[in-house]
């Protein structure tokens, strides 16, 4: 039986690197993979997944209204060979129904799905996609990174253009190292309490 996997972490833990490495392992053996990324996440260019260490690959951009089960079912029957695995980067941006659609890809199409994403936002709240994945994924995998103090980083702080901590704002604001810093819970709390 195929499974739905969710590998989660805070920012800068290497989630995209792990995704690209796992996809490469399939491709190196001549297996077909499908990589997905949210259409509005164009930091590496439209329809591209990139890691901070320089690895990158093309991906299919998805929108909130897209039926991912239908997409994978069509691609699997397009004559280009069976899909061996589906990879989703920035999985926190999935909608709850899209997570269920990916579960059906694993359950009904027999294709494993590996989703990688953030668990929580800059306010310590779950993203809807992450919440659904934490609830229904067959396997959960924590990807670890460290705070400046050496402890495990589990939280992220969002910074404004002047480097000041933001406590309010939209949950989704795509950015990289210049906008987000990962901390352990204690140091996240310290930063969020700064005057």
Swiss-Prot record:
Per UniProt, ATP binds at 9-16, 89-92
**What does the subunit section of this Swiss-Prot or TrEMBL entry state?**
Homotetramer.
Annotated Zn(2+) binding lies at: 147, 149, 184, 187
* The protein's name in its UniProt record: Thymidine kinase
**Family, per the entry?**
Belongs to the thymidine kinase family.
Could you give one GO CC term from the UniProt record? cytosol
Which GO-annotated molecular functions does the record name?
ATP binding; thymidine kinase activity; zinc ion binding
Q: Which organism is it from?
A: Rhizobium meliloti (strain 1021) (Ensifer meliloti)
Task: Indicate the enzyme's highest-level EC class.
Answer: transferase
Q: Where in the cell is it found?
A: Cytoplasm
The protein's predominant localisation is cytoplasm
Reaction catalysed by this chain? thymidine + ATP = dTMP + ADP + H(+)
UniProt keywords (A-Z) are: ATP-binding, Cytoplasm, DNA synthesis, Kinase, Metal-binding, Nucleotide-binding, Transferase, Zinc
Tell me which residues this entry annotates as catalytic.
90 (proton acceptor)
Q: Name one GO biological process term.
A: DNA biosynthetic process
In short, the EC number is: 2.7.1.21
Q: Which Gene3D superfamilies match?
A: 3.30.60.20, P-loop containing nucleotide triphosphate hydrolases
